[in-house]
Amino acid sequence: MTKRNHAIVQTIALLAGLLTLGWAGNALAFHDGGVAHCDGCHSMHNSPDNPVEGTPNNQLLKGSDASSTCLNCHAGPGSARSYHSLSTDATVWSPGGDFFWLTQSYTNTNWSGDVESDPDNMGHNVIAADFGLTVDGTNTVAPGGSYPASSLGCASCHNPHGRVDGGTMAGQLPISVSGSYGEVPAPGTIAGAYRLLGGGGDGSGLAAQPIAATAGFGETDVEHPAYGEGMGEWCASCHGDYINDSHKHPSGNSEFLNGQSTVYNSYVATGDYTGAQGTSFTALVQFERQETDVTVLAAAVTSTAGPDSGDNVMCLTCHRAHASAFNNITRWDMEHELLAEGWPTAQNLIDMGAVPNADYYGRDIATEFGDYQRSLCNKCHVKD
């Protein structure tokens, strides 16, 4: 090969690399805060891979149902920068959690005998037939509400078209930036909703879209969502009895932590109350800030500071939104006295094909908190 031809080949390779990077960047910004390009989810002539299919899907979707269409992109291995929500090894460590836990069960033995876990109880049972996710076999309606389990899918919570308060046809300005990262929209435009959540005037019946910001797709103590006002009320769109009725744990904009914030900030672990507010935050026990300015929230997504007395408890303080390793989609095992002895066990994780410590997002609970760490309810209530 001549030097000239070699130079041409190198130039072509460089351009190909740059184009690949460009396409990758565009792929990561597919929604970009609003409605994406239509053929990402729909097949205009029922030919998603060129040949015409025999039977079209509803709405000409590329999956057999809406959630399967979502998972065509959102299923895959997890990482700190992955937008996936369903893996095969429990590596999606996002704030919402991994739908992996809906596909697995395990058996352990206690004083009553063999106990088998119920995957229906580990998450929101979105129906995605192409990925083996089926209707909840236990609940026919949302606990604490009336939303039918047979209708539950990704679009029950997320607006796949990204409309804010009904979109432009309802008089809203066009969307120019994501609503998840505190970006400032260009003049004459608005930001999208946090994580494309539905609500407001979009016809979904959901409460007003909550205000929040996040640093990325993972969740750690130093990179995490900062939740503003309205998250509890939004969850109550389907689970209203849990936020309105008495004799249940309070949650919502008016449920201030008050003196419990002092407890949260001093609590490090069972028997260790040497914490300080500036470093007391743990992603295992989230809280909601009394804040509606998304730029302020965006500045808090890497904060290690705990709550003020005016911050409040919300549904996501104790639960995840998608799925978790624990009953009732909780963030930690609430059914065992000691977290280190909780379920799933290390052997359960191996048997399910999950990576080590996947239940706590890679955190070794015994190493971090000690062998005798009690429930993380004590982060606010310190009864241990």
Regions inferred by a protein language model and the residue ranges of each:
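Cleavable N-terminal signal peptides
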Residues: 15-17, 27
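A motif-centric signal for short, conserved binding hotspots located
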Residues: 28-384
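A periodicity- and composition-biased signal for non-globular, repetitive helical segments
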Residues: 10, 16, 48-51
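Bacterial N-terminal signal peptides that target proteins for export
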Residues: 2-13
